[in-house]
């Protein structure tokens, strides 16, 4: 009897958890302490959370433990805390005002005086977002809300993200969720004045080291993310979005040349054998064709692609996504690169040998022993380059370097040395 495939369980984003924590804190400020919180996500699903109170000095926080479902999310199980306080003493702070007409986080910034609780306004809380609702229906106008963060939420240090440089990485949709959740509570009590919402993730700084944040220029913590409020398990789209965002950020920074590497092998090879710093490269995983296309669309004029032969040999066969779930034609493609001048009987015998190999490294041993490795690799990298240029739409120069962990550089296209030398000294 065929076993039914297990249905994977979805979870909630950091944005949804932060909104729930802030909502619980808002209730507490009104004198109503909750142990459970419900809210509707932008995707329409109603989320229910158990909340935990934590008293830290004179601050009272309410926490929600993130449940990412069956998604392999490093933030699964992390506690996300929120606090809401009345701003009551004069103290200047910088705020980033969210424009009604633009939710892309290109904000106008002003410096003003507001009443701020001295104990709540500690170092690291120097910037805050102020909510300006889209319509009067969103907010009665009797109070103002400001949103900032404590430890564990990263600070944006590079342009091109959906939050301005110098602000905490709290993305537009989560910000709106947080503001609306607190607004709904405060309006029930006819609140007046200014209120400060703070977020805190105790493990955020450590967790961030396991994410793309350091590479994206988000320092000191994780991001508060989400568009639908729901985490869909095993999402390829999330990884693709991250890769595309990093390429976009480099273009925004004025870069016109790019290094792409599928993964850790390529990055290590760049550093150890080519003398190029790891952080110079964008890791594109298995999304080879997509990364090339995104780079061309972003305006890159040059791409240096460096990857292990075990992955790039697939590209020589026109494979756009090198994940094994799309098939494994490595040996067939390798055999197809054998010299056309071979005697038919020899070619058939050598083809059978290659097709019987389990790894590309094993196949390379045969090619080396037959004295044709350089010829085969020249053919392979030429084909890789041809396909990559096609995927770029003919809009940029693509050079390729492929290597083996045993034999080092196996093949490279004609102008790759020039690009390597320039990157080495950049």
Predicted feature residues:
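A structural signal for small-residue-enriched, beta-sheet-centric alpha/beta enzyme cores
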Residues: 9, 15, 222, 227-246, ...
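Short, amphipathic C-terminal "tail helix"
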Residues: 396-425
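Generic N-terminal targeting/processing segments that precede catalytic cores or assembly contacts
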Residues: 1-91, 121-210, 214
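Acidic/polar hotspots within intrinsically disordered regions
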Residues: 114-115, 123
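Cationic, low-complexity basic patches in intrinsically disordered or flexible, solvent-exposed regions
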Residues: 99, 114, 131-133
């Amino acid at each position: 009897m065929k076993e039914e495939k297990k249905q994977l369980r979805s979870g909630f984003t950091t944005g949804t958890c932060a909104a729930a924590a802030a909502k619980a804190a808002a209730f507490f400020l009104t004198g109503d302490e909750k142990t459970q919180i419900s809210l509707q996500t932008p995707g329409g699903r109603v989320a229910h959370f158990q909340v935990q109170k934590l008293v830290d000095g004179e601050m009272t926080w309410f926490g929600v433990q993130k449940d990412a479902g069956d998604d392999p999310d490093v933030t699964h199980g992390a506690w996300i805390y929120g606090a809401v306080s009345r701003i009551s003493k004069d103290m200047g702070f910088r705020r980033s005002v969210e424009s009604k007409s633009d939710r892309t986080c290109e904000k106008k910034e002003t410096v003003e005086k507001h009443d701020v609780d001295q104990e709540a306004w500690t170092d690291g809380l120097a910037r805050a977002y102020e909510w300006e609702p889209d319509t009067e229906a969103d907010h009665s106008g009797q109070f103002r809300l400001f949103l900032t963060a404590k430890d564990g939420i990263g600070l944006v240090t590079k342009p091109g993200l959906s939050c301005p440089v110098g602000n905490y990485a709290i993305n537009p949709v989560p910000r709106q969720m947080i503001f609306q959740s607190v607004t709904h509570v405060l309006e029930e009590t006819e609140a007046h004045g200014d209120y400060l919402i703070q977020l805190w993730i105790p493990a955020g700084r450590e967790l961030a080291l396991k994410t793309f944040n350091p590479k994206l220029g988000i320092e000191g913590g994780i991001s508060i993310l989400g568009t639908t409020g729901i985490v869909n398990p095993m999402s390829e789209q999330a990884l693709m979005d991250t890769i595309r965002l990093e390429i976009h950020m480099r273009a925004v920074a004025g870069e016109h040349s790019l290094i792409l590497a599928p993964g850790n092998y390529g990055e290590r090879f760049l550093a150890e054998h080519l003398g190029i710093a790891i952080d110079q490269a964008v890791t594109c995983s298995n999304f080879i064709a997509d990364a090339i296309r995104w780079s061309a669309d972003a305006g890159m004029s040059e791409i240096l692609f460096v990857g292990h032969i075990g992955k790039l040999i697939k590209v020589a066969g026109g494979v756009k996504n090198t994940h094994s779930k799309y098939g494994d034609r490595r040996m067939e493609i390798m055999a197809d690169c054998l010299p056309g001048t071979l005697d038919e009987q020899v070619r058939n015998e050598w083809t059978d040998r290659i097709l019987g190999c389990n790894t590309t490294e094993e196949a390379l041993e045969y090619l080396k022993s037959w004295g044709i490795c350089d010829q085969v690799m020249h053919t392979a990298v030429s084909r890789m380059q041809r396909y990559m240029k096609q995927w770029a739409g003919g809009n940029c120069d693509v050079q390729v370097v492929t290597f083996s962990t045993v034999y080092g550089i196996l093949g490279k296209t004609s102008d790759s040395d020039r690009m390597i030398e320039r990157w080495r000294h950049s």
